[in-house]
Regions:
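Conserved GNAT acetyl-CoA-binding A-motif
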Residues: 69-80
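Methionine-biased hydrophobic packing positions in alpha-helices, especially
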Residues: 61-62, 74, 109
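Conserved acetyl-CoA-binding loop-helix of GNAT-fold acetyltransferases
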Residues: 48, 54-67, 93-94
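Short, conserved structural micro-motifs that define repeat-unit consensus positions
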Residues: 27-29, 53, 80
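Terminal substrate-recognition subdomain of acyl/acetyltransferases
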Residues: 98, 104-113
């Protein structure tokens, strides 16, 4: 994948970093709330356009997100996923995420960095 665009935002709750692939086919956001979760970055909005899926782009974007977590001295990465999206839950497990909690709608997962 070519270079990615990183954009950092400061919010009242912390900081977020947006990562977009150079061709615009994929993006991910990593949020840091050091008051509530001082050692865990939160990965959200990982998306790949449908025509570019199953080519490793999502894995590369996730690696960028995990690298950003490490750069911010996080020791864990967290995310939520729709519990009905079995394929995606299994994909996150293959990437090393483990179940932290669940309710009837979503699964919270965590990965040690």
């Amino acid at each position: 994948m070519k270079t990615s665009y990183l954009h950092t935002n400061q919010w009242f709750w912390g900081e977020s970093v947006d990562i977009v692939s150079a061709d615009g086919a994929a993006m991910v956001c990593v949020k840091f709330d050091k008051k509530t979760f001082p050692k865990a970055g939160y990965i959200c909005d990982l998306s790949v356009i449908p025509t570019q899926r199953k080519q490793g782009l999502g894995s590369k974007m996730m690696q960028y997100a995990l690298d950003v977590c490490r750069e911010h001295e996080m020791t864990f990465a967290r995310l939520h996923v729709d519990i009905k999206n079995v394929w995606l839950c299994e994909w996150y497990e293959r990437l090393g995420f483990k179940e932290l909690s669940r309710d009837e709608h979503e699964l919270e997962m965590i990965k040690e960095l």
